[in-house]
Amino acid sequence: IGKNGAGKTTLIKIITQLLFADKGTVSLFSSHSENEWTKALSRVGSVIESPVAHNHLTAYQNLKYYCMIRHIPNADQVIRETLDYVGLPDTGKKVFRDFSLGMKQRLGIAIALLSKPDFLILDEPINGLDPIGIKEFRLMIQRLNQEKGITILISSHILSELYLLANRFGILDQGKIIREISKAEFETLSEDYIVLKTSDKERACQVLKEQIQLQFKVVNPDNEIHIFGNEQDVKQILKQLTLADVAIDEIYFARQNLEEYFTQLVE
């Protein structure tokens, strides 16, 4: 995860030897030398920046070409199985340049899967996809992980979607990994809180302090107060604020999400 310009694509290009780092080392599948690292790349598939294929060829023809240059046996069977797996079984004579963005992403992943990789790297794969395309992509990636045992590295800034898909997050800022956290760890750290929106902020704070005795913080400039409690506390808060004639615009229960966590780290 990282903002635009944080170094996500640069890091991926270094891992795949498309760029060379000024300093530091890369260990891939426990490689201990540059030669071992290069050999380990045979176990890696990737789609970096945007899917690349021959514009004038169909999906089948593109995979046939890559099977030929990679000397992949039983090409016809491999191609049909791969196209079916990524959801492109019936594209017929349509050529790559006429594909939708979602179809291009699927073909890019199909090309990356031909060599049966253990590690798949995808750079901003859901950019530009519509909601249906994003959901289909998510289901495909989950299948690849669960059915084929492929480890998948995804770079993205669409955090809500990553949260549904990933089980570990690395946060990149200004070229450095500043935090690595599992989904389980994040959920343990996430705070439950009650959001109160009121035009009478000062009076509301006074009531919270004197009558309810829960910790809270004011979030400016939205007249929003975050009260650190659980859902059962909402009724008591409503009761005390109503008795004090505090105007309540909105009140609801919330939990810190990945976007808020990321923003706090990089700002």
Model-identified regions with their sequence ranges:
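A generic structural signal for secondary-structure junctions
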Residues: 45, 71, 87, 170, ...
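Residues at or immediately preceding the N-termini of alpha-helices
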Residues: 33, 37, 183, 201, ...
